[in-house]
Amino acid sequence: MLFCDDSKKYLKEQNINLKNEFDKDDKRVEKFSLKHQNIYFDYSKNLINDYILKSLLESAEKSSLKDKIKQMFNGAKINSTEHRAVLHTALRDLSSTPLVVDGQDIRQEVTKEKQRVKELVEKVVSGRWRGFSGKKITDIVNIGIGGSDLGPKMVVRALQPYHCTDLKVHFVSNVDADSLLQALHVVDPETTLFIIASKSFSTEETLLNSISAREWLLDHYEDEKAVANHFVAISSKLDKVKEFGIDLEHCYKMWDWVGGRYSLWSSIGMSIAFAIGYDNFEKLLAGAYSVDKHFKETEFSKNIPVIMALLASYYSCTYNSQSQALLPYDERLCYFVDYLQQADMESNGKSVNIAGETVNYQTGVVLWGGVGTNGQHAFHQLLHQGNIFIPVDFIAIATSHHNYDNHQQALLANCFAQSQALMFGQSYDMVYNELLKSGLNETQAKELAAHKVIPGNRPSTTILLDELSPYSLGALIALYEHKIFVQGVLWDINSYDQWGVELGKKLGKNILKAMNDDSSDEYQNLDDSTRQLIAKVKSK
């Protein structure tokens, strides 16, 4: 059964008015909120009532969702176009039950690889790993892009209060040399360890940055042997790693059943462990595992990722929402939106179903946002008075790591005020009367009132964490991961491939050849616009 069928459109005819719904039901918050350990999920400010929620849940029950959940956790190859299992959950699974993929118990492999990463981290942190000149490592530079960068960078920043080593961790991703130079300007070649994170060891941006970092190192040492002391790799291409000069003992695994955007739980999370220590990294995994169990074992009506996905899919199918705002009210989560943009949009930005047929309904949306209260002085105007339908997720942390309680109270007050303003708004009469009370005459009040009306009745969800710890952050990330999965099932699309990014890579290589040789076939096959752009660049 398709989730986006005509029946969903009729639900809109319920004409939900949030103010009225709250006025007539003093148990609305109790009914439309859930709790998982230290995470409180309030979805009462959404455009639903008992009937709508019941209808959405019935659709989920009639779908293949239950079977798909079992298939994913059991290692079925649900990534059908690449014939791969989807098992990032296995990386944080604390059980000992065997899980066989292609004839191998991957639990044993995962345990072995975790131990290798732990030993490396402890060796570097303790000072037993030394640079080529014998000095202790002080800086880690992670070179990767996409999932090899966004997830670890987000977590390292979010958990800054938990940094417990003397290591400074830097991230390099963009092929623009400025990205690399920002890191190289603040590190010492004698005390820096580079992590090259690339499954194929051929990702253009990562490889180019790695080669330049290697040249920088050798400009200092003038000895190829130094590479082994200052580089480790996370890759499945051992021959390329060895050719680069990295000791294969320090090449860490990436499995085909872990997608890049879900890989921070794997060896890709090494940079996280260097910052917060391996014990805290394990707590991050444990938090995610707690949500995995919640997702697997909880009935849909009390299942947070399922409710998240049902609401988002409902708005997409029924209200034609093309955008989702994500507003974390905590500066530590400043990279959370960037991280989820990739996780969500690369997963569900599809236009054909599992069978390869073009779908006639909307799937993925544009996920965007920023940290509060910055957004209030930037784009919240559009949320409150624009005429685009944009559901909002607020993320708030009840307690902070610092002692500036007045700052924390102001931050939370602003967060809750924004969700309340989206819900209630302010009517023309309210504004008009306030303007009269402020001293304006009737003519002036009438002229200004229409400009100050805020329609309200705009849906939002608030996710409140007790604290932002490794455990709770792991849980938060897993909630969104499973939401993405559920939406893919409801829309009957493959959330785990990303063929849309391949064409640009291919054309980029062709254009690079064309830029270097205007007699090449690649140049001759260019369109006039691209040829003219190249000419403009060459003329400078």
Curated annotation (Swiss-Prot):
UniProt name for this protein: Glucose-6-phosphate isomerase
Organism listed in the record: Francisella tularensis subsp. novicida (strain U112)
KW Ribonucleoprotein (keyword) present: no
Family: Belongs to the GPI family.
EC number: 5.3.1.9
Catalytic activity: alpha-D-glucose 6-phosphate = beta-D-fructose 6-phosphate
SUPFAM superfamilies: SIS domain (SSF53697)
HAMAP family referenced in this protein's UniProt entry, alphabetically: G6P_isomerase
Subcellular location: Cytoplasm
Role according to the record: Catalyzes the reversible isomerization of glucose-6-phosphate to fructose-6-phosphate.
